Each structure stands twice: as structure tokens, then as C-alpha cells.
């Protein structure tokens, strides 16, 4: 019997038959607010089945909307049932009722039923909150217009930090974007950045950008601007458009760099040409300070000269010049390094890491620049923050050819660093490196006997004697030099003097001496030094002989000896030009 009565109730509700409901209730009254098997009240079923008459009857006879698990007004909106919604509101349904973060207005927006949205908005709801984060991507132009018309805020970020404008940009809905932009439906600077990144970087759309540009506040965010993103993403069309509408290319982002910096970093010559006309070297030196150092590394010499046009008329700080120099060293381009040195950069100034330019050239293996720095007069005895000279660095890196070069330029082999260690002590155990260092030390001692009394020399010799392999090299050097000292070319002048001689006019006198052949055959440790001076003696002698003969028609009135003396004052290059 109870089952039949229950079935009759369901049929009456489904058929919206109030008379049957009334008869059933008069026969045996029941609790209208008691949930059924599916945890739903009779009113819930009536609302779900769009039974308007039954729902109104139930409400007038004590059914409470609060007894329903899901608010009836939300159910009616889900069903797009405007009539039911009006009935429920007439019996006190709250337009701001919320179920699991969902309000009637939010539900209406999700369904896209404009008539219900319009009706609910006429009831002055507080908004589609708290579940607004579920509807931004469901907005249509019509629903958005209604919300804006009724002053419903669309600039509150959802749980992902996005606003309605972001989702409109994501879908590429130009009409909706325009509506939101015109009504300032935008939030903080972070949201602006997300929107710009989406329409320029990740999902490029120039039409969206053009609409966003209607609100210049969106393009000119605090720090990173639309132009920064366009340049960084290499969107040439966007760059040209933004420049045409007057976007300021001199704005610095949160990293204190301008769009020009990113154009250089991307090596995009076309965009670089579009931007460069807006910049002056004064701006780059005083404001956009990271751009020129970057340009040292990425630009060609011609592009760099174009960027730096007029820089000589600007007073540059020593630190800034030093930064430019260190960046130019990394390029291994002597022309660029020469350009910076020509501006007055200190060739021996330490960088932020305490290194000197010569050491930076070794670190970055820029051999051409290393040689240029030496030619420009870099101090081979300058020390870094650890007290290491370039000789310490070269010895540790086994650069034996460069070791010979800096030793010839006067690098101090006995210099100590902050740890009290000399280049020989810091040297990597490489045969050629150790041999180069020890042979130089021994030849210094042979040239000047007083050096053996120097504490630093004593320290170096003591260190060498402490390692058998080093000691053997030292003994080999001493024996070879002693043999050279005993071989006299003339009275008071030995083969040793010939090997260490720097005056080419002197060694030219011995070009045909028979003992030079002996020197060439017997030299071992000092073979390179001996061969160099033997070759130079022949070269110098040949040039002098030819010069004397060449000048005879012009200086025939002078004795041969005088002409020879005059020619001796000329360098080899000058003699070759005669």
C-alpha cells in the first residue's frame, strides 16, 4: 500500500497534477520536508521535473526550501526553468544562496541562458561569488554585457590568479576582449603580464594585441612592457606595431634592461635596426647599463661602432669601462678590445671576481686577445685578488708557450701569492712547463750572481731541490750553461753571452763564427733560445750588409764605417724598407 501511494505521488509530481497531490495529502498527511530514498524532498523532485503548479502548492503548504540538499533555485537555473525560478523567488528563495561554491547567477552564466541571467541580475545579487573562478571561461559577449551593465566585477582573480580578460584572450574572442578592455576589467600588474605573455609569447595574436592596446595601462606594465615581450619573442610585426602607436622603448624591465638588450641577445638584426634609432649612447651608458656589455659579446665590430657612436664624448666611469673591457675579452676579437681600450679602459684593473684582464683571456681561451693585451702594455706582474700574477695562472694551466712570452716581458718568476707560493710551486707537473720555468730561473742566476742571495730565489731553489725530477732538470740546466760559459767567442764574450744577448747588432758580428755551429748542435734545454739568436744574427747581418750597399749611391761621401754605424741605428723593419 505504501509503495502504491509513493508511486502515485511521483506520477502526480511528474504530471504536475495538484489535485491528486491534494487528495493524497488529505487522505494521509505526510512530512513534506522529510528526504526520500535519494535524499531528496518532494519539493526537490517537483523543481527538477519542472512541475510549476505542484511546486507552488507545496511551498504554500509548508515545504521548506532549506530542507533540500541542493537549493531549489540552483536546480531550476540548471534546468533553464525561468518560470520555476520566479516562483521560488516569490516564496523567498535567496538569489545569493550557495551550494559547493556555486550560486544561481554562476550557474546561469555556465548554462548561457541570457533570460535567466537577466532576471537574476534584476534581483541585485552580490555577484557570481564565491564560485566565480568557474565561470570566466564560460562567459559570452551577451552574458558579459549583462554582468558589466549590472556592475558585477569581473576583475577579481580566480583560483589560478586569472580574470575574465585572461580567458577571453585565451579563447581569442575579439568582441569579448574589446568589451572587457573598454570596461577596465583588469586587475593587478601580474595579471597584465600573464595576458601579454599569452597573446605575444605563447599564443601570438596581433589582433588581440591591437585590442589590448586600447588600454595603454595594459601595455605599459610596471617593469616588463608589451614591447619587451615582443622583442624577446622576436615578433617583428608586434614590435613595429607597438613602436608605431608610441610605446616607449626606453622603459626598463625588472632586470633593469630595455627591449634593445633582448634584441641584441637574440641576435635579431631586423628588430635591432627597428629599435636602435630610438636610443642614444648616453641612455645606454647612464640608464640601460647592461646593453653595451652584452653588445660586446653579441655584435659585430661594425654594429658595435654604430651602437657606440659618440661615446668618446661621454665621461665613463672606470668601473663601467672595466666591465666593457672584460666582456670584450670574451669575444676573442682584438678589434673590439682595441676599441674599448681606446676609450681609456684600465688594462690592469680587476673585475668583480678579482681577476685581471690577462687572466680572463686565459680563462676564456682568447689567445688573440691575450697577445693584444701584452702588446698594449698589460702589466705581467699585476696580481689578482689571490695575489697570483699571470705567470702563476699560466704555470697552473700548463701554457708553456705563453710562459716563455711573459717571462721575456719581465714577469717575476719569484713572485709569491697570498698563500706564499711562487709560480714554480703552483705549476702543474707538466714537463715542458717545469722545464721552461726552471731553465729561466737558472739563466737569471747565471746572469746575476747576487740573485742567489735573494730570499725568494733561495726559496725557489730549495723547493726545486726537494723534488728529484725538478732537481734533475735544474742540474741539466746548470751543466749546459756552464759549458756555454766556457766556450769563448772572443775574449770576455762567451756562447752564454751570445744566447742571452738582446742587442742584435752585437750578435750579427758573430754570424760566421765556427762555434755557432757547435752551439746549434750541442744546445738542448736552451736550444730554442740559441736557435733564435743564431737566426737573428744571420737576419741582422744580411739586412745591414744590404743596407750599406743600398745607401752607397746616396752616402758615398761618407766612409764605409760611418755608413755601417748609421745603419745599425735602424730596426729590422726599417732596414727592410730601404
Swiss-Prot record:
PROSITE patterns: ANK_REP_REGION (PS50297), ANK_REPEAT (PS50088)
ANK repeats: 4-34, 38-67, 68-97, 100-129, 160-189, 222-251, 255-287, 320-349, 353-382, 386-415, 419-449
TM helices/strands, residue ranges: none
Coiled-coil regions, chain positions: none
Cited InterPro entries: Ankyrin_rpt (IPR002110), Ankyrin_rpt-contain_sf (IPR036770), PRANC_domain (IPR018272)
Keywords: ANK repeat, Repeat
Record's protein name: Putative ankyrin repeat protein FPV022
Taxon lineage: Viruses, Varidnaviria, Bamfordvirae, Nucleocytoviricota, Pokkesviricetes
Amino acid at each position: 500500500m505504501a509503495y502504491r501511494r509513493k508511486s502515485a505521488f511521483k506520477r502526480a509530481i511528474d504530471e504536475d497534477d495538484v489535485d491528486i497531490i491534494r487528495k493524497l495529502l488529505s487522505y494521509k498527511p505526510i512530512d513534506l520536508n522529510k528526504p526520500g530514498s535519494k535524499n531528496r524532498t518532494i519539493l526537490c523532485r517537483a523543481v527538477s521535473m519542472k512541475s510549476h503548479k505542484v511546486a507552488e502548492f507545496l511551498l504554500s503548504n509548508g515545504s521548506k526550501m532549506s530542507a533540500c540538499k541542493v537549493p531549489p533555485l540552483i536546480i531550476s537555473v540548471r534546468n533553464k526553468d525561468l518560470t520555476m525560478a520566479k516562483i521560488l523567488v516569490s516564496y523567498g528563495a535567496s538569489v545569493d544562496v550557495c551550494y559547493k561554491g556555486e550560486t544561481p547567477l554562476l550557474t546561469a552564466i555556465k548554462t548561457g541562458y541570457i533570460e535567466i541571467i537577466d532576471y537574476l541580475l534584476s534581483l541585485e545579487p552580490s555577484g557570481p561569488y564565491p564560485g566565480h573562478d568557474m565561470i570566466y571561461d564560460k562567459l559570452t559577449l551577451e552574458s558579459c554585457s549583462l554582468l558589466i551593465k549590472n556592475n558585477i566585477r569581473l576583475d577579481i582573480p580566480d583560483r589560478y590568479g586569472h580574470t575574465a580578460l585572461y580567458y577571453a584572450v585565451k579563447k581569442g574572442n575579439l568582441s569579448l576582449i574589446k568589451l572587457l578592455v573598454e570596461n577596465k576589467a583588469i586587475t593587478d600588474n601580474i595579471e597584465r603580464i600573464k595576458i601579454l605573455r599569452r597573446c605575444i609569447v605563447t599564443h601570438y595574436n596581433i589582433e588581440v594585441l591591437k585590442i589590448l592596446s586600447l588600454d595603454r595601462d595594459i601595455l605599459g606594465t610596471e617593469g616588463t612592457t608589451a614591447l619587451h615581450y615582443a622583442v624577446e619573442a622576436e615578433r617583428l610585426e608586434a614590435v613595429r606595431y607597438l613602436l608605431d602607436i608610441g610605446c616607449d622603448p626606453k622603459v626598463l624591465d625588472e632586470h633593469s634592461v630595455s627591449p634593445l638588450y633582448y634584441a641584441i641577445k637574440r641576435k635579431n638584426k631586423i628588430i635591432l635596426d627597428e629599435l636602435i634609432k630610438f636610443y642614444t649612447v648616453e641612455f645606454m651608458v647612464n640608464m640601460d647599463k647592461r646593453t653595451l656589455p652584452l653588445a660586446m659579446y653579441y655584435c659585430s665590430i661594425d654594429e658595435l661602432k654604430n651602437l657606440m657612436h659618440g661615446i668618446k664624448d661621454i665621461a665613463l666611469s672606470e668601473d663601467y669601462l672595466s666591465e666593457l673591457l672584460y666582456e670584450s675579452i670574451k669575444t676573442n676579437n682584438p678589434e673590439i678590445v682595441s676599441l674599448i681600450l681606446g676609450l681609456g679602459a684600465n688594462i690592469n684593473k680587476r673585475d668583480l671576481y678579482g681577476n685581471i684582464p690577462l687572466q680572463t683571456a686565459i680563462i676564456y681561451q682568447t689567445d688573440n686577445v691575450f697577445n693584444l693585451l701584452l702588446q698594449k702594455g698589460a702589466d705581467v706582474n699585476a696580481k689578482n685578488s689571490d695575489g697570483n700574477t699571470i705567470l702563476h695562472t699560466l704555470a697552473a694551466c700548463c701554457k708553456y708557450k705563453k710562459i716563455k712570452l711573459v717571462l721575456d716581458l719581465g714577469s717575476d718568476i719569484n713572485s709569491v701569492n697570498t698563500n706564499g707560493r711562487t709560480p714554480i710551486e703552483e705549476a702543474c707537473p707538466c714537463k715542458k712547463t717545469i722545464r721552461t720555468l726552471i731553465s729561466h730561473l737558472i739563466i737569471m742566476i747565471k746572469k746575476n750572481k747576487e740573485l742567489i742571495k735573494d730570499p725568494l730565489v733561495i726559496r725557489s731553489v730549495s723547493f726545486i731541490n726537494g723534488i728529484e725530477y725538478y732537481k734533475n732538470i735544474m742540474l741539466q740546466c746548470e751543466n749546459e750553461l756552464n759549458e756555454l760559459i766556457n766556450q769563448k767567442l772572443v775574449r770576455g764574450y762567451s756562447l752564454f753571452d751570445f744566447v742571452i744577448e738582446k742587442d742584435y747588432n752585437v750578435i750579427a758580428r758573430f754570424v760566421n763564427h765556427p762555434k755557432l755551429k757547435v752551439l746549434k748542435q750541442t744546445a738542448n734545454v736552451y736550444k730554442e733560445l740559441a736557435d733564435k739568436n743564431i737566426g737573428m744574427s744571420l737576419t741582422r747581418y744580411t739586412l745591414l750588409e744590404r743596407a750599406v750597399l743600398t745607401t752607397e749611391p746616396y752616402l758615398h761621401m761618407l766612409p764605409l764605417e760611418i755608413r755601417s754605424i748609421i745603419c745599425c741605428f735602424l730596426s729590422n723593419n726599417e732596414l727592410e724598407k730601404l
